[in-house]
Amino acid sequence: MDILTQLIGNVNDVILTYILIIMLLGCAFWFTYKTKFVQFRMIGEMVRLLGDSTGKTEGREHHISSFQAFAISIASRVGTGNLAGVATAITLGGPGAVFWMWVIALFGASSAFIESTLAQLYKVHGHNSFVGGPAYYMKKGLKQPWMGILFAFLLIFTFGFAFNSVQSNTICAAFEEAFNISPALMGCILTALTLIIIFGGIQRIAKVSSIIVPIMALGYIFLALFIVIMNVKHLPGVIELIIENAFGWEQALGGGIGMALMQGIKRGLFSNEAGMGSAPNVAATADVTHPVKQGLIQTLGVFTDTLVICTCTAFIILFSGLASTGDANGIKLTQMALNNEIGDIGTIYVAVAILFFAYSSILGNYYYGEANVRYITRQRWAIPVYRISVCDMVMFGALASLDLAWGLADIAMGFMTICNLIAIVLLGKYAFRLLEDYRIQKRSGIKNPVFTKDRMKDIEEDLECW
């Protein structure tokens, strides 16, 4: 097992250091420039669209709303990356990793806008809802069905299996620390709950997510704000520590900046998923009048995940000063940091929070995989087999080592993201045109912009739902 963990780590170093970071930052800055800084200029519109329920499709009761699509994507984004991932990034990359998490969120949000807008543009009619995502725009937009199948397999493995094993691993570690519950028992409980909900389909997942997500996110944010207020005199010093470790001479000479950069981007990507090709799978299911609406909604999801929730965790850890001791890593470091601020109840609070955070991620991750199973095959047996396999991986994650679980997730994430970034760079011109169409309608006084496929006659035959 140690040899396998080391091998996976070596492959990850090559992918994440020499390929993925360059591609992520390159795409982020390119899309930011081409969209005229859409992620900064249209924040007000993003918030307004959360209440948008106007679709143009008959039988809308079978489709999900903009807010439900937002909730499912946040359910997947807001998971172990926000508590355990931030702790790991700070432990391995130092406080400077937090700065690079902010950078990848601020600029990478433009990639999230492009991929989700394209997913809406190329969505198709499913059985009870729209379906779409990178596999569909690779097939219909790029005319490369083989690429869509490759991406679908990568996503199924990454989200359905690898990421869900990480979520399960973190939940079990937190409950073992807080309540001394064995990972095997907790794994059985998680597996049973997962079976019950995922066999209810996208509507049940949407309902559960739209309830869990606001409660868990707001509860954690309020606790973090309380801790920040308690430590407000230390806040300038913590921010200075983050900036100094991101750019300081001492860190540059010691190679610390490179480690901070790599950890910040790696954990930031795992947390907010910008450019990864995951959120577009649920963005495509929303019933909206214009593809840009879901692009903006999913951009807001990136900001919510990293700039708000990940930052809360980072401040809690850095206020405690425990990151520099090396006594703990991952979720246990976050638990120890909260204990330092609010007493022994901190361990229990984090265990409960991670249960909601990570379990909602399991549900969101499951749906991403299901959408791609349906892309690969329409055989009726495929979905039940996939559902059982997901539950098997939830159980596997409960018993696996932390390093192996994270390593598998990282390598799968890297290959999948590279595949998606290539596609959205090639198809980005259509998202730019859609954004311009949306802006023109808004400037002309239209409060609710509407898109029809005759506005893009050159690709009209590929746009099934418009």
Model-derived regions: residue spans:
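N-terminal alpha-helical transmembrane segments of multi-pass membrane transport
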Residues: 1-80, 91-96, 425-466
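Transmembrane helix-loop junctions in multi-pass membrane proteins
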Residues: 3-4, 34-39, 81-86, 95, ...
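Extracellular loop-to-transmembrane helix junctions
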Residues: 9-48, 91-128, 304-310, 411-421
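Membrane-interface loop-to-helix entry segments
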Residues: 23-30, 35-47, 169-175, 181-231, ...
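Helix-loop-helix module between adjacent transmembrane segments
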Residues: 27-32, 104-128, 134-169, 173-198, ...
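Flexible loop linkers connecting adjacent transmembrane helices
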Residues: 37-64, 88-98, 102, 110-142, ...
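Alpha-helical membrane segments and immediately flanking helix-loop junctions
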Residues: 57-90, 118-121, 127-135, 139, ...
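Extracellular/periplasmic helix-exit of transmembrane alpha-helices
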Residues: 113-122, 127, 223-241, 255, ...
